[in-house]
Amino acid sequence: MSTFNSADIAAFNGGVWVFCEQRQGTMMPTSFELISEGRKLADELGTKLYGILLGHNIEGIAKELGGYGADGVYVCDHPLLENYTTDGYTKVICDTVMEYKPEVMLIGATNIGRDLGPRCAARLHTGLCADCTHLDIDVPKYKQFLRESSTLAPAMIDGIPEEDRNLKMTRPAFGGPSSAPASVPPWPLCAPA
């Protein structure tokens, strides 16, 4: 089992990534939604936004992502990736993450994302927050969101450090209309949204 020290974590500054899910050469709508959300996060961090797209004969659909705000796309095209397999996709994504080192990675809360996200997080020894309904980096904006939409005590909200660059996430709590803030250890931050 590997562990990361602060120097290792500092190396993970390769932008915000979105796992772009496709099936039989058709991009899933969740991918476009996450590209849009990822664009906001990348802008807040002052970094680039990249999609990561796996499959076979997918070069054509990779071009679609630029129109939705991606600065680039990592395309992993191989016959063995034509259909989703847990082990294959996990290996390719984790190997690519370790090579290019994104700061944040978003994965859709689809059937594939719910299978893939936890496996990648475990293999990369990082945190994962599922079913996110709000993502933010900008601390003042996030505090305002929490004040307006959560039942947290103001002292808890005010206790969030202003210099915190980590991804802030909000997810449903207790199966009802309430929500709870969440955070994961630094790098790479995975959030099925």
Please give the residue ranges for each predicted region.
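N-terminal glycine-rich FAD/FM-binding segment characteristic of electron-transfer flavoproteins
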Residues: M1-A193
